[in-house]
A protein has these predicted regions:
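Positively charged n-region of N-terminal signal peptides that target proteins for export
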Residues: 1-3
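Bacterial N-terminal signal peptides
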Residues: 6-13
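Structural signature for solvent-exposed beta-strand/loop edge elements and short helix-capping sites
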Residues: 18-175
Length: 175
């Protein structure tokens, strides 16, 4: 029994390991970049094998990440991880933005065409689904406690868009 209690924290830990524990790690403007293999050619650093990007409030993992040294930006496919406590999956990363992103926290689910890796992260072209609302918004800011949407159109029922509410701003708290 005691043995299982010691293993419990390991089993409850996220699937990705800390970026600092990878064999190759370097510090970038956006946080720690790490992976199992590292190569460098003409200003492009390629990190492969459980590649990761991590800083407080952000932990991403991808098959590989390219760091474009001169621009300070990134290229990566199929990312997963967390941002400000929101679980996320993204089809890709270009520069300092995640592309075609799915986010989830509590009862809220969101999709964004782009998620800028600012502090806090800002989404563009957002669709948010709460238990009672479906919302399309031009922009959203995601924090650990809320999703703040600007310039949006809401459908308050799952029955479709027969009823629409247009507003300048709305705040959805994470439960």
């Amino acid at each position: 029994m005691r043995r299982w209690l010691l293993l419990l924290p390991l089993l409850a830990a996220p699937a990705w390991a800390k970026c600092a524990d990878r064999p190759y790690v370097l510090e970038t403007e956006e946080g720690l970049l790490g992976g199992e293999n590292l190569s460098y050619e003409e200003g492009v650093l390629l990190v492969e094998g459980r590649a990761c990007l991590e800083r407080p409030g952000l932990a991403l993992e991808a098959p590989w990440i390219r760091y474009l040294e001169e621009e300070g930006g990134f290229l990566a496919p199929r990312l997963s991880g967390e941002v400000e406590g929101w679980r996320l999956q993204a089809e890709g990363m270009e520069g300092k933005a995640l592309l075609r992103v799915r986010l989830a926290k509590g009862s809220l689910r969101a999709e964004a065409e782009r998620l800028l890796l600012e502090r806090p992260p800002k989404g563009e072209g957002v669709f948010l689904e709460a238990p009672a609302y479906r919302v399309r918004a031009e922009r959203a800011t995601f924090t650990g406690e809320e999703a703040r949407l600007q310039g949006f159109l809401a459908t308050p029922c799952p029955c479709g868009e027969d009823l629409r509410l247009a507003m300048e701003e709305a705040l959805f708290r994470v439960d």
